[in-house]
Design a protein with these regions (language model features):
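A general structural detector for well-ordered alpha-helical segments in enzyme core domains, enriched
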Residues: 88-92, 116-120
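Canonical Radical SAM [4Fe-4S] cluster-binding loop centered on the CxxxCxxC motif
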Residues: 40-88
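A general secondary-structure boundary signal
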Residues: 12-15, 86, 123
Length: 128
């Protein structure tokens, strides 16, 4: 199902197909609802939200990334913080419902290593 968002503040439409990843955006719509050809400079809300659900990195702590020659911009070797709670993620997702096309899950480590990744993915699906 194609997701369609009308930006009332800046008067344009975005459409996203979650199955194919196709994304299109109109220009600013004129008083007749036609594309004016003028590119909207910004949206009233981001269409992609990058949420740092990971507070630490299993691979970084073991030094595996360093041994492979991979530098970590998140200080995975030295920093250990708790991962984001499902409740906090749900709160973010609910605030974004109907306003965002995609959630990018990240943080300090592999998001698929989050203990509640199944719940987080379900929350993404429910709030797309």
């Amino acid at each position: 199902m194609i997701q369609k968002i009308f930006d009332e503040k800046y008067n344009f439409i975005t459409m996203f197909n979650p199955e194919t990843g196709s994304y299109v955006r109109t220009g600013i719509l004129n008083q007749h609802g036609w594309d004016s050809g003028i590119d909207p400079f910004q949206a009233s809300f981001p269409h992609l939200i990058d949420v740092g659900i990971m507070g630490h990195c299993i691979h970084g702590k073991t030094g595996l990334c360093l041994k492979a020659g991979i530098g970590c911009y998140q200080s995975g070797l030295t920093v250990y913080e708790p991962n984001m709670s499902v409740e906090d993620f749900q709160s973010i997702a609910e605030q974004c419902k109907g306003r965002v096309n995609q959630f990018a899950l990240g943080g300090r480590g592999d998001p698929d290593q989050h203990a509640q990744i199944d719940q987080i993915l379900m929350i993404c699906w429910e709030n797309n």
